[in-house]
Amino acid sequence: MDLWKFFSKESSTSKNVAKERLKLVLVHDRANCSPDFLEMVKGDIIKVISDYMEIDEDGLDIRLTKTKREYDDASIPALVANIPIKKMKDRGR
């Protein structure tokens, strides 16, 4: 019986992962945003932020997701960035 639970949990987890991936694909499609475009945005963000701080580019995570608008709860695309900062640069302030 424990073996059955193990496999059913695995398929449930795989199902959830597949569901989340499908949601992400749909968000990208509805926002009319290709992976190449997202990479261009990521490169531009790195260039701008690097003027002000040293960042961990390997830990950088930029993705397109969806969120709800406050005034009408409509689902809209959102650009979410997690940018690990190594240190702030001295800009002569």
Swiss-Prot record:
Name of a matching Pfam family: MinE
Tagged with keyword Cell cycle: yes
InterPro entries reported for this sequence: MinE (IPR005527), MinE_sf (IPR036707)
Signal sequence segment: none
Coiled coil: none
Family named by the database record: Belongs to the MinE family.
Name of the protein in question: Cell division topological specificity factor
Organism ancestry: Bacteria, Bacillati, Bacillota, Clostridia, Peptostreptococcales
